[in-house]
């Protein structure tokens, strides 16, 4: 997605060979126009999948998920990382290790909002080692719902998360695939199909 790649190049900051900071438009400050375009792109890619619900994880996955849900006409349910006084019982639970925060979180979804009749699109901001996506898949599978695919805003293709998910037969659609963050420079995976001008 060209507009996203341009945003990453112009406003993203490479902090190391593994870490890209995109807090200027995605995971702290949010660019709503960009999120709207991201939502439209996810909806376009998954429009034939009969999605009934989008599942994401708090908090950075919420904005792109809501925009995609608006386009698809479905609801969003986000996995919580912290226990809530109002959501204590009747939960699906999974453990997820965060590479960025170097900690394991117990994530949960209420059983009241997802069931075996749902066809789910999972959306997240980043895909690196795949732990968040695997945790979300576990929650969806515990509910008996089917997974239509996973939409990722930015995939670090040089890490093994995407490979792990695809090897399990999961459809993964990434809007920006990064081949490398070496030497403080973002290098994107070359698309196999050239854009028609």
From Swiss-Prot:
Metabolic or biological pathway, per its Swiss-Prot or TrEMBL entry: Purine metabolism; XMP biosynthesis via salvage pathway; XMP from xanthine: step 1/1
GO biological process, one term: purine ribonucleoside salvage
Keywords: Cytoplasm, Glycosyltransferase, Purine salvage, Transferase
One GO cellular component term noted in the UniProt record for this chain: cytoplasm
Residues annotated to bind 5-phospho-alpha-D-ribose 1-diphosphate: 128-132
GO MF entries: xanthine phosphoribosyltransferase activity
Source organism, top-level taxon: Bacteria
Matching Pfam families: Pribosyltran (PF00156)
Enzyme Commission identifier(s): 2.4.2.22
Residues engaged in binding xanthine: 20, 27, 156
Subcellular location: Cytoplasm
Enzyme class (EC, first level): transferase
Signal peptide location: none
Reactions performed catalytically: XMP + diphosphate = xanthine + 5-phospho-alpha-D-ribose 1-diphosphate
Coiled coil: none
Function text: Converts the preformed base xanthine, a product of nucleic acid breakdown, to xanthosine 5'-monophosphate (XMP), so it can be reused for RNA or DNA synthesis.
Protein name: Xanthine phosphoribosyltransferase
Annotated source species: Bacillus cereus (strain B4264)
Upper classification of the organism: Bacteria, Bacillati, Bacillota, Bacilli, Bacillales
Gene designation per UniProt: xpt
């Amino acid at each position: 997605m060209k507009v996203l790649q341009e945003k990453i190049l112009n406003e993203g900051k490479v902090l190391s060979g593994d870490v890209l900071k995109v807090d200027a438009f995605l995971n702290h400050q949010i660019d709503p126009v960009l999120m709207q375009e991201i939502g439209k792109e996810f909806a376009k890619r998954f429009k034939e999948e009969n999605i009934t619900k989008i599942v994401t994880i708090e908090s950075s996955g919420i904005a792109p998920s809501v925009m995609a849900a608006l386009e698809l006409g479905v609801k969003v349910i986000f996995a919580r990382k912290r226990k809530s006084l109002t959501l204590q019982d009747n939960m699906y639970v999974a453990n997820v290790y965060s590479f960025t925060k170097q900690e394991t979180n117990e994530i949960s979804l209420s059983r009241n909002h997802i069931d075996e009749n749902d066809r789910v699109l999972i959306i997240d901001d980043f895909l690196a080692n795949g732990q968040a996506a695997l945790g979300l898949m576990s929650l969806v599978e515990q509910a008996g719902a089917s997974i239509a695919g996973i939409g990722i805003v930015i995939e670090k293709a040089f890490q093994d998360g995407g490979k792990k998910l695809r090897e399990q037969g999961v459809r993964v659609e990434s809007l920006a695939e990064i081949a490398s963050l070496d030497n403080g420079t973002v290098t994107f995976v070359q698309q196999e199909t050239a854009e028609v001008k």
